């Protein structure tokens, strides 16, 4: 009889390499926020993948970048601390991009860890097969990886194979979470992330990092209806105008798209109320960062 495997796996990589897409693919639900804007993941999102023979808890770390404010410092601290807590590390890179300074910075960091490190080349659907092997050899010249696996998280190509390879390196152990649990974050947190994702999709480049979402109230009013009130925080009046849009059109569209995903998450009808408030320079206010849910790990 095959022993049951269980373990914690950290996904690390530069912004926009597809970490959140991968987590959502293997879990089968939208847990991690997805956007083409950089630095959209702010907390360690734990997605729980349960199979008959294994349970893997994926920790989706914030993309590595040079911090520009207190929130950035926090995101980097989360990423680095994660490396010391887990059973395996997925270093995810874009197969269709050159190795950059950010990749080299991460590799230097990974050389000092004793945990197995898997190089996962994502977005192979965008690369000609002849270009893949030279890219793999280039990465191999930097360090010895435990395994190297090319995938496409978006299409699901080679993802199951990677999971099979990963499982062989995980320790034998019990299930840490019930079969039907897909995240260790409360539903309120995931709801806030869904709202933030819709804003990122609908707003311009100046907005993304200045957006914070706090779910103020979430009440089940009846068997099939949940009432949610949430506040969207921006740093400037001009940003507030962009999020609301002409005649409230943009905010209405954010609500419409968010409600659809939240209803799928909760399995019930949702009445969603959204407000937009200005909190100047909030990304440098530690107490406010904690208040809206980006909380430091307790020792």
Curated annotation (Swiss-Prot):
Alphabetized UniProt keyword annotations: Cell membrane, Cytoplasm, GTP-binding, Membrane, Nucleotide-binding, Ribosome biogenesis, RNA-binding, rRNA-binding
GO molecular function terms noted in the UniProt entry: GTP binding; GTPase activity; ribosomal small subunit binding; small ribosomal subunit rRNA binding
Keyword Membrane: yes
Gene Ontology cellular-component terms listed: cytosol; plasma membrane
Positions that bind GTP: 13-20, 60-64, 122-125
Residues annotated as domain KH type-2: 203-280
Domain Era-type G: 5-172
Region (G4): 122-125
Subcellular location: Cytoplasm; Cell membrane
Primary localisation category: cytoplasm
Region of interest (G1), ranges: 13-20
Region named G3: 60-63
GO biological process: ribosomal small subunit assembly
CDD domains: Era, KH-II_Era
Spans annotated as G5: 151-153
Region annotated G2, chain positions: 39-43
SUPFAM superfamilies (UniProt xref): P-loop containing nucleoside triphosphate hydrolases, Prokaryotic type KH domain (KH-domain type II)
Pfam families named in the record: KH_2 (PF07650), MMR_HSR1 (PF01926)
Membrane topology, as annotated: Peripheral membrane protein
UniProt family annotation: Belongs to the TRAFAC class TrmE-Era-EngA-EngB-Septin-like GTPase superfamily. Era GTPase family.
Subunit composition and interactions: Monomer.
Functional description taken from the UniProt entry: An essential GTPase that binds both GDP and GTP, with rapid nucleotide exchange. Plays a role in 16S rRNA processing and 30S ribosomal subunit biogenesis and possibly also in cell cycle regulation and energy metabolism.
Record's protein name: GTPase Era
Organism: Staphylococcus aureus (strain bovine RF122 / ET3-1)
Higher taxonomy: Bacteria, Bacillati, Bacillota, Bacilli, Bacillales
